[in-house]
């Protein structure tokens, strides 16, 4: 089956919709994708097997678009990807080009020269070659979704023509991957529901994210890095600037924490020669909302922390130790500085007691206070409203919750409170699904369990399909460090999720996961899609041959091999 025109048409339609994360246009593109599925012959005959599953409590009305082609047996391959994109600010006056693939082919003269002046040289060369398609989302990742839709149509028609065809193919397009992955978090419940309803066994999931070439090999990931976002709130001791040595500047303590953690090598894990990027802070500032001549009482910030295997409990314990050292280091600095500038105007050193608390410990203190229940409901509701209207993002809302809880607690002495802000991405590796976790499971709930090394086996099968169909050589990578929805395919154990939830101020209706569904959804997964370049940039593009010819037939062969072995 030739896929070129079908994939191109699907992609052009999707790209034309500016489905930026957390905007109403996400729902618009999900409706478009649902329409594409509904018009396919298989779903025209079996309309109950495709549809849209609403994300619970989502103010934008976003959905998971899905379709299930049912053959014989329980074995199932899942194709998935996200339909949201990042904004197009960097396009400037050429913003219209972001959503019009065809326009890139027809721009000429002075306009073409002006456009080229905004592109790096490699992108100019690729544009001139005619071998690449440009536009927002062609690479990340509407190109992959377009392939997925075409593959669904191929397999659906195959089942219609040959009802005895073995295997099931499930397609799911999700929202919000570029922000908080609300779509994939919601999709897990859909996947578990479909499995129970139709008796499916999920043998493999392919996230159709773009690939890249390295050393002449198209790279395939069998895992995805984990991510937490620790948020830190420091309360010092207020003092007039004239008496600065009598107080404790919260910014100073937070700065010590920043220096201890920013790009810290101890958090950079290594796995089979691959290195995880170290932590980096996204935000750091005082909590003063006006001007006065006192040292800041409070300061706060949040950082991104990636990992291959470390748990949220391990992260929290290490950060608490660093917090204690940050207090000690800054207070020692105050002593040495005071000795250098001592005069008659400087007050004697005051020894300040201090502590470091997990958010869960602060919340426990607050729960014992009179009137906490009603006060907390009002606070949570107000902040949730601000998040829904866009007045705050999740990390900002986390800091607001922490600040309000600390005030309600009545704690007036210096303290550091550490929590987790959304989003949370558990580390995932397909080869490690067979390992026993803390809950004693080995390989999940599917019949026969999941064998250790399953990701490598699937990669080898994909490699064979690439060689047989296109003569291509693939390369295996363990972890995608760019964050992906694969994080929700590994069934993190309930104990670890509970450890995260108790220290996440927004946990509840603002940010949630179906813990039972997540714990039970364990499927070997791959990241594999068309070759692309410069995601999130004006020069974003996808290789036409990879998109329209190579990846579709590789996946076609891979799926047939998967079902031939069941």
Task: Kindly label every feature range from the protein language model.
Residues 192-399:
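Midchain, well-structured core segments that form catalytic/ion-binding scaffolds
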Residues 2-136, 158-167:
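Acidic/His- and Gly-rich active-site-bordering loop/insert found
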Residues 128-223:
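Acidic/histidine-rich catalytic neighborhood of metal-dependent amide-processing enzymes
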Residues 85, 232-239, 307, 527-539:
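A glycine-centered beta->alpha junction motif in the catalytic cores
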């Amino acid at each position: 089956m030739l896929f070129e025109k079908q994939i191109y048409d699907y992609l052009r339609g999707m790209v034309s919709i500016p489905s930026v994360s957390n905007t109403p246009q996400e729902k618009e593109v999900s409706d478009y994708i649902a329409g594409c599925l509904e018009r396919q012959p298989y779903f025209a005959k079996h309309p109950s097997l495709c549809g849209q599953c609403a994300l619970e409590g989502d103010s934008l009305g976003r959905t998971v678009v899905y379709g299930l082609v049912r053959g014989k047996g329980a074995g199932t391959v899942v194709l998935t990807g996200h339909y949201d994109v990042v904004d197009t600010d960097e396009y400037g006056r050429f913003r219209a080009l972001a959503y019009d693939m065809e326009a890139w082919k027809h721009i000429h003269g002075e306009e073409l020269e002006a456009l080229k002046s905004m592109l790096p040289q490699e992108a100019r060369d690729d544009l001139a070659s005619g071998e690449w398609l440009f536009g927002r989302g062609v690479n990340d990742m509407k190109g992959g979704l377009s392939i997925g839709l075409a593959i669904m149509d191929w397999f659906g028609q195959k089942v219609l023509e040959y009802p005895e065809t073995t295997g099931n193919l499930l397609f799911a397009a999700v929202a919000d991957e570029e922000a908080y992955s609300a779509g994939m978090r919601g999709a897990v419940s859909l996947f578990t529901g479909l499995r129970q309803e139709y008796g499916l066994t999920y043998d493999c999931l392919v996230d159709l994210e773009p690939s890249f070439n390295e050393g002449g090999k198209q790279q395939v990931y069998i895992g995805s890095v984990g991510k937490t976002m620790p948020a830190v709130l420091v309360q010092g001791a207020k003092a007039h600037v004239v008496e600065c040595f009598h107080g404790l500047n919260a910014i100073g303590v937070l700065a010590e924490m920043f220096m201890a953690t920013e790009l810290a090598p101890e958090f950079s894990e290594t796995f089979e020669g691959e290195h995880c990027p170290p932590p980096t802070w996204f935000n750091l500032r005082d909590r003063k909302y006006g001007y006065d001549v006192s040292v800041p009482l409070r300061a706060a910030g949040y950082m991104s922390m990636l990992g291959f295997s470390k748990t949220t409990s391990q992260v929290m314990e290490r950060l608490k130790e660093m917090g204690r050292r940050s207090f000690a280091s800054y207070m020692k600095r105050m002593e040495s500085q005071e000795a250098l500038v001592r005069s008659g105007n400087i007050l004697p050193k005051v020894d300040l007691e201090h502590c470091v608390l997990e958010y869960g410990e602060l919340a426990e203190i607050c729960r014992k206070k009179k009137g906490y229940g009603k006060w907390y409901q009002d606070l949570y509701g107000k902040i949730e409203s601000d998040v829904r209207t866009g007045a705050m993002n999740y990390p900002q809302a986390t800091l607001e919750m922490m600040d309000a809880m600390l005030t309600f607690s009545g704690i007036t002495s210096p303290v550091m409170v550490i929590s987790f802000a959304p989003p949370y991405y558990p580390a995932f590796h397909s080869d490690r699904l067979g390992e026993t976790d803390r809950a004693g499971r080995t390989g999940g709930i599917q019949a026969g369990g999941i064998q250790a090394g399953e990701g490598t086996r699937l990669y080898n099968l994909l490699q064979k399909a690439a060689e047989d169909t296109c003569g291509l050589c693939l390369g295996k990578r363990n972890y995608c460090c760019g964050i992906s929805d694969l994080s929700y395919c590994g069934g993190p154990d309930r104990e670890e999720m509970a450890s995260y939830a108790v220290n996440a101020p927004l946990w509840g209706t603002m940010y949630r996961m179906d813990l039972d569904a997540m714990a039970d959804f364990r499927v070997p997964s791959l990241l594999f899609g068309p070759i692309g370049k410069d995601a999130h940039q004006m020069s974003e593009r996808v290789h036409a041959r990879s998109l329209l010819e190579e990846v579709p037939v590789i996946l076609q062969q891979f799926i047939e091999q998967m079902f031939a072995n069941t």
